[in-house]
Structures are given as structure tokens and as C-alpha cells.
UniProtKB/Swiss-Prot annotation:
Family to which the UniProt record says this protein belongs: Belongs to the helicase family. AddA subfamily.
Transmembrane domains' residue ranges: none
UvrD-like helicase C-terminal domain boundaries: 541-838
Binding site for ATP: A38, S39, A40, G41, T42, G43, K44, T45
Record protein name field: ATP-dependent helicase/nuclease subunit A
Cofactor: Mg(2+)
Superkingdom field: Bacteria
Amino acid sequence: MEQTGPDVPERVGAMSGGWTAEQLEAISARGGDVLVAASAGTGKTAVLAERIIRRITDPIKPVDVDRLLVVTFTSAAAAEMRERIRLALAREISRRPESGHLQRQAALLGRACISTVHSFCLDLLRQHFYRIGLDPSFRVADETEAALIQTGALEEVFERRYAAEDNIFAALVDCYGGRHDDALLQELVLDAYKFARSTPWPEDWLDGLAEGFNLPGGASFDRTPWSAVLKQAAEIELAGARADLEAALRIAREPGGPQAYLANLEQEHDLVCRLLQSCRTNAPWAELYSYFKEVVFSPLKQCRKEDADLKLAGQARNFRESAKKKVMQVKSRYFSLPPEDLCADLRRMAPLIKELAGLVREFDATYRKAKAARGVVDFNDLEHYCLQVLAEKGPSGAVPSQVAHELQEKFVEVLVDEYQDINAVQETILQMVSRKGEGQSNLFMVGDVKQSIYRFRLAEPGLFLKKYASFSAGTGGGQGRRLALTANFRSRQGVVSAVNFIFKQIMTPAVGEMAYGSDAMLVYGADYPPVPEGQGNYEEAVELHLVERGPAGKDGGGDDPAGEEADGGVEAVEEIEEELEAGQKEARLVARRIKELLGGSPGGEHALEIYDRELKKYRPLTYRDVAVLLRATAGYANSFVEEFRREGIPAYAELSTGYFESTEVETVISLLKVIDNPRQDIPLAGVLRSPAVGLKAGDLARIRLASPRGDFYDAVVAASLAGQGELSERLADFLKKLEEWRTIARQGTLADLIWAVYRDTGYYDFTGCLPGGGQRQANLRALHDRARQFETTAFRGLFLFLRFIERLREGGRDFGAARLLSEKENVVRIMSIHKSKGLEFPVVFVAGLGRNFNFRNLNKAVLFHKDLGLGPQLVDAEARVTRPTAAKLALKHRLKMEALAEEMRILYVAMTRAQEKLILVGSARNLPGCARRWCGPAGTAGWALPDGFLAGAGTCLDWLMAALARHRDGAAIRELAACAEEPPAEVAADRSRWRVFFSDSRGRSAEMAEEPVLLAKVRRMEPLEPAGPLAGMIKARLEWSYPAIAVLGRPAKAAVTELKRRFDQLAAGEEQYGEGHFESFRLTAGRPLFMQEKRGLTAAEAGEALHLVMQHLDLTGSLDITAVRSQIEDMVWRELLTPEQAAAVPAEKIAAFFAGPLGRRLLAGFQVLRELPFTMAVQAAEIYPELVPYPGEAVLVQGVIDCLVDEGDGYLLLDYKTGKRPLGRPEEAARRYCGQLNIYARAVESILGRKVKEKYLYLFEPGLEIRCD
């Protein structure tokens, strides 16, 4: 029976019209600011759209749509909102066509303010540029152009400072510049600049940096902003130590427990409690320092075997050792220096901090001047310039300007979507354009702070939390009104319950920045119909798969929180290698599980049936229904793509690596370097050795012998003149081409140069013939496109392009390999959790949960925080000493806690993407050791896990497993850890259902309810029970044989043209095809040039040429015979056709087609799709009648549709026949080819989900149309 109670909300019920009471309240709330806290899957976008629609269609007090300001997070969301409003208006107008107001709203919609914040700012600046002295012709620089301008400005600033020989600047370089250059200091200046620009008044923030370090003599450290933060840090650690000691005391007091330890444990528990109380009551720092100075842990008394159970003694010792480690870490980290020394360190940093702030100001001015010279602004400028138009800085903050007052008067309401992701600058802008005052406030904000995952873009979830705390629930009062949407209409009960179970335990105010209370919990509202009997396997339980990582001798899974203290080096490399190995294992497991869910596992479960809301029925799972979500795709995603490819699973992933490392791109970039400057030995040798020139290693040696000294280019020139036969000729040809390319580089565009290189070397065509040729050519096309995009910026030329690429590579950035598949195809999507936000999928795998949190940024020399300012590392160059200042320790703690809260929210977003099935995958080393750590807080009273444990977690898996170890389905985890503590009854009896699986280092998987328990018994040398049902299952699997023997030998894939031939033979009564009777698909290679010159094109090649022309014709202009011939000539110029192919294409017959009824219908269509490939599975019995007894077998059919025309009420399907061979009467042609068209139509209706209303054959030779019914 499912549990209900105060912490477990009942299932929601829908109101009339499909809206719940919560949603209706959010739609209709008026009179004051409103904050809607909308949990995942609660329909917040629909609620926001309905609120807007009701405001503009209100019969009593309607509002014009252009008097609403609607702010969205993305342009796609803005377009979706505008379309929702358009459709709603169209429906209302159809019901009330006489309404002039509705007609007016439809006309105003195009100019309505529905956009992102940046788009709103851009529009405002276009109108009010003159108020801030902005050039009216300004444009927005893209990220590439802005980065190049920034680099130039920063180098200019540093050159000036070096020329001035400033001692303080020199000290700044010595302390923070790096070992060999000033690269780290340049990075520090950019970091400080970007952080300052995230605040409404950057100058004020920079001014405040040094103030906190100018401490007067005798100043108390307690008066600094960092003192309280460090006490909070100590408090969390000490609370964890207290919990460990309490667990040790419980074990020591058990029968058979190590009572000899009690005296030590009680004394140490009292000590930790006193320290904890001192931190909580904000005792003076000097007092705390004196307390910690006296802290010692005495050795434990000996515990003999006859006095206590040694197993219990070991557990108590482990808990006590953990507590000791925490306390001594607090002592050494925060209380190793007296407060006077802490203040002295801060005072020493003041001159350097002041110099850094001045450097940032100088860079800002130089960068602004450089942008003005080019007539550009960057994205940050849009917000700050907009703020200059809207606000003036007053004593207590921003004061609305005249423009702001005009906008306040204009906008009846300001509606903000994804409010949790805005920053302080955007918040100030919204405050300036919204009204204030009792009954006048008009700001409507929708968001979910649990899904605020853009802190790396300097979003501030604290803005949402502050309003949530200050606004009143229910009918209002105070500063505004707070509403909640909790009914989840996306996920099944099993997913909802699992999410609630985890986050009630891990999301606490201290670590998660908020409590996961009743207002935050999800309530099941999806109302899935029951699965019909016999329609596939369905399981409500959430799965968690544990993969054994690395050697079993090491402990892992989060002991070192993401390498927080690591410096990189060998440890970092080993960690990366281990994560890549874990990624491969997880990918293999996920691939196997996907095949099982699709019913592709012999002897395995049936295909999973999912509920299709559009079809309103259950259907089998397909690849496009599955998503694999990763915290970060770098490294891990490649493993999944490769493993899925190996298993035959189509997958799509937006990879951000692998582009610059691809051989074809490396080769072309080397050639571009040689064109820019041929006196570069390594690129030149690489180009000569590459297929673009094709020399051998021995040839390079002979070239060098031609001129042993000097540049290799001089040797190439000498060898080309040395008369060495073929080698000299090839080098002379290369040098001639090189001069031509250098001329193009000087006189033409970069894109023209790259395409000339492709054409002249034949390298583009060559790569297409290699394995993976399609991908290689896509990469080369992408290089051409990026060169073209680069020249749309203020930068031009080959040198700057190569410099830009070099900067990207030095910064570890990559474009990612060009993509051949689209995510809209029937593929498994592999994406980052950030990319998945706002999406939903029937089946979700969340993988990589054992990857360490990335805290490496916390080891930078200087840290920044919006409230705490700057935290520097103290560097004493003379004494060669470096240590963190108290400011840095405070910032490091605060930033780490904020990062943990962000990781928690990212996990929440990932788990709430699932509609029907959620599968979690993570890896860990030394599973029993990890289990002991996970079970440490198992006996904690109440729902929330201890803050000390949560803050010490190194991976999401630590959180998940510690929570699951307290569930009844996690009993095997506790047994594996030999955990004697029982979890609280209310937690253990939670309504959620879980299945935990363990996969060892060899990839063998078993449900953790069985194998880990047995493994633990073997390790404890305990006897095992008889084999039981497991032995029977193994025997059945080993003796299994494939039941559909008759299917073997039949082709699993066929082209449509082959099916036509088979249908013809079956219709003629010929004997059925046997094994090997099906013709295989053949690739027709182009004939050698000498054969083409003698013989011309075959009929098949001429037909291919005509199809190519029909595919590429521009349908927007005239298509008479003159226009058709002109387009064919253009295709020859563009190298889509050869001259021989063009001569074989009957232009007059194409013109006749377009002059006829079918051609006119094609031109009038809403959308025309040409040469559309497809792959479709059909029942094998449809092709092989003898396989009727095997209904589960399928054959893949693939083909290419010549033309598909969308006519609004359905598709018109066309198939061209171009041969000159007589086809007999129209009835004969229809009999031969209409079966082929029926398969095409079926594929279209199945894949695109729309009806094909008519099918036509068009025979070009006689110019005949034949309808296929």
C-alpha cells in the first residue's frame, strides 16, 4: 500500500477546463507582484501563456498585447510563446469574428514585446542610442570577435604597464602571473572584469575590493565579512564529526560493543559539542583559536577479543577516526593562525588588490575604446547600456529615468519566465520597467529555483529565494504574493516518488540553499492509463546501476571531492584515464539496457510499451524515445557514441571535441599555415607528406639533401630546380599552386581560398573515399563555413584566422566534429543535463553519476564572490611562501557550498526529465568501502541527511546511495557495508520503488538484492545458501536456442527496388525466393575517365543526372525551358554536374513537366521535400509469406522518395521514371511501379505522421502522369 501523510501529498485533481486549482490561481492572480514557484513538469509555460491570453481576451478589462512585456530565457521560448498566443487568438477570432479588439490583437502581435532580456535591451538601445552617446549603426559582436578584441586590448594594457616600469604592477605579475609569463595574470584580469560586469554598478564593485583589506591597526578579525563564513564552515564540519561520534557511541553501547572506548568517545563528544556551540553562538575568533589550540585526541584503549565483538569495535573505530579527521582538519585549515596574523595577511594584500582593480578599469576603458572603433558592442554591453538608459545611480540604488517611467506607464504587466536564472543586472532592469506601490506593482515571475543551473553564467538563484522568503503565501500582503505549482503532469508515479524520496533527504538549507518541503515536493498529476495486458513489460521501479571502476584495491567514489586539493599533474591524468574507462563501461551497460527495453535481447524481456499522448494509446519504445543525460559531455559522450555505434544503436550527440584533431582538418590548417608563411618547416613537411601532395618519406629526405642548410622551403625550391625527374616536377607544380593560393589569400576572401585548395588538390574528394568519408567531408565543409563566418566580423585575412584557431586550441576549446545525423531522426539522444532542461523523454538514462564534482576552480590564486568580494592567495616572493588568506578560505567555502547546491539542482533537472522510466548509472571503486561510507548516516533521525555528510560528498552517487541505503530496497547496501544501524521507519517505508544492480569490472551484471549480499558473505567467510532458482535461470539461458529457424538466411535489409522485383515475381506465380536469392545492394563506382570519353553516359547515369537536376532546381523563379537550361549551366559551374551529365539532361522535358498540372501543384505546395531518404521496419511476413508464423520478425526497408509536396491537407507523392525503355500501356507501368509508391506512402505516414492523399508516377520520356490508387 502506498504511503500518504503530511510529507506525501495526495494525487492532484484537475479542475474544469483542464486547469488545476493551483494553475487557475496563478493564471488569475492580480493586484501586486506575484512569484510562482513552479516545480518540474507542472505546466508553467502553459500557465504563463494562458495568463497572457486571458489578459488580452478579457471581455471586461482587456489589455493590448503590445502593452505586456514578456521576458523569456531563450529566443526559442519567445517564439513558442508568440505562436501559442497567435493560435489562441485565431481560435477566439473564429468564435467571435465580429470582435474588433481581437482583430487588433492579431495585428499587434508582431510588434509585441515578447523576447529575451538581450533582445529587449537591443531594441531599447536602437531607439535611445543618443541618450548614452552610442553610434546608431552599432552591431553586436559575436563571441569570436569579442574574444579577439579583448585579447588585443589586454595585450595593449600590459604593454603600457611594462613600459611604465611600475613596481606594484611588477609585484602583481610576480605573485599571480605564473611561472614563465603573465598568462595567469591576464586570465585573472579577464575573470575580474567579467565578474564586475555581472553587477549593476561594476565601478562600485571594483572600488569595494580593496576596502575590506585596508584594516586599521588593532582591528578585530570578527568585524570582517569573512569571519562569519569561516565559522559556518567550521560548524558544518563539526556537526559531521559530532554525528560520527554519536554513531560510535551507539555501537559501543550495544551488547558486545567496545565499551572500553566509551570514556574516550564521551569525552571527545563533549569537546566537539562545546566547539560546535561556540561556532553557532558566534564566539570571538580569539576565543575559538584558543579552544582549538588545546584540541587533542587521546589514543583509544585496547579492546580484546574476549571483551567485545571485534567487528563492532572496528566500526566504532572507523566512525571515531572520521570524526577526528574532521576536527583536526578544521583546526589546521581555519585556526592555525591567531586572528592578529590573519589581519596582517589581509593588510599586506591591500596594495596588490588596489592595483588589480586599477588594471581591470584600464582594460575596461581600452576594450570599450576598441569596440567603439569597430562600431560593435558585446552581449554584456547590451544590458549595461540599457541600464544606463533606464536608471540613474542614487544613494540607495537605482533610480528610474524618464525612459523607465515611460515604459512603466506603457507596460500593464511585466511577465518573466525562468526567473530563477536571471542575474543582478537583469533584475535591476526589470525593476526599472515595472511599477511600484500599493496595488500598482505589476511584476509576474515564474520559475523553479530547484532548476537554477546556470551559476557558471553568473545567474543568481538567491534573487528568487529572497523573494520567496519575503513574499506572502496565499492572498498576498507584504512585498508580494507567493504561489506554488506542484502537480507534475510529466512523470509516472514511480519517477515522482523517487525524486521526492531523494531530495527530501539531500536538499537542505545549509547545503542545497533551500528545504525540500511540501511546497517544493512533486505531486503526481499525469494520470497515465493502465498498461493493457499483454502489451509489453512495464516496471514502476527506478533503476540504479553501479559499475565497478578500476582496481578493487583502491577506495574511491568521492573520498577526494573532485580533486579539490589536487594540483593536476599525474593524479589528474590518472583520474581522467580512469573516468574514460568508467565511461566505456557505463556506455556498454546503457547500450545493453536500451536493447533490452526495445526487445532486442534474445531470451530477454519484451519491448517496453510507452504511452503516446498524441496517439492516445500505448506503443512500443523507439530509439527517439530514449535520452542519455550527462553532467558534461566532454570525454564521456565520445565513449557512448562509439559504444552505441558498435552495438548498432543510432545516436546523436553534440560533441565539443574531436574537430581540430581530425586528420583532414589538421592537413588543411597546415596547408593554410604554409600559404600564410611557407617558411614553417613542420607544416610544410606535413603538407608535402599528406595526400594533398603525396610525397613519401624518402622524397622528404632527398629534398633536404638538395639544400642541407636553411629553411625547408629553400630546400623545396632547390629540389624543384634540381632536375630530379618526377619529384622536381611535382614540387614545381606545388610551388606554382602555392603562389596562386597566396594571390587568392591577398586578393580574395578566406572562404574562396579554402574552396580553391579543396578543388585544386582534390583533397575534398579524396577524403570522401576514405572510411568515414561523409564525416570527413562534413568537417571540411564546416571549416569553410567557419572561415566565411569569421570574415563577417571586423577581422579579416588568413593570418588572423589562423591566430584565432591557435588561440582556441591553446584555451582547450574545440568546435566539435560536424554532425551528419539530426536529433529529429529516430536516434538515441546523448546530451548534457543543461541541454536537456525544458525537455522530456519517455526513457531517461542519467549516466556518469560517479564522476567527481569539479572544484578545481577553487584552487585558483584569486577567487571572486558577489557578496564577499575577492579572496587572494598570499604570495611572499622573497620568503618563497604561499598560503591562503582568511578571505580566500571564506570564499572557497562559500563557493564550494554554492557549487554543491548547483550540482544538487542539476541532479534534480536530470531526474525530472523522465516521463515513464528513469535509469541512473554510476561507477565507483571498491564497492564495500564505498558502501560503508554511504551507510555512515543511515541511522540519522528524520528525513534530512547530515549537512556534514552532504557537504563532504564528492559525487552525485554519494548522495543517491546514502539516501537509498535508508530505503527498504537498499537493504543489500547496508548488508554489504555490514551496517548494524537501522534507518528511520518513515524513511525506510517510503512509497518509492527501487532496483539496484551491480556490474563488476568484467561487465557482468546482477541485481544487488542478490550478488552483493553473496559477495559480502564470501568476503566474511560465511556459508552460502543452496543455489535456488538462480541455477535454473542460468541453465535455461545456456540451453536456449533461437526459435525462428526459418528466418535465418533471409536478408534483414532490402531496398524498395528489390521489393518491387520480388513482388513482380510473386505476382507472376514464380517460386519463392530461397536463401541468397535477394540481390544485394551494390555501390556503383564511377567508370574511369578514359571509358567515359569513349562511351558517354549509360542510361542509369543519365537518369541519375536528371534526378540530381530535379533535386537542386530553384523552384522560386520561372521554370520555362530557358530558365531550366540556365539553372543546369549554373549547376555545372557549381560543380554539382559534369558537362557530360548536363548534356544528357532533357531540359525541354523538365520544363514541360513544370508547365503541366503535376508541376504546377508542386510549385504551389507549402513545402517541397526532394530526394528524401527513409528507413522503415515492416513485418517479415509481408515480404516472405512463408514467415507468417513468426509475427515478431521484421525487415528493414530503405529507399529514397523523389518528391513529397505538402499541400496543407496532406502530401502529394511523386516518383519520376527517366528511362527510354518502353513501359507499355499506363496500366502496365502502374502495375510495375505502384507497389513501390505504396511502400513510400506507408513510410511517409509512419515517420511523418501525416496522410499521403495522392501518389503519382511521372514518365519523363512520354511526358505521362499516372495516378496510383
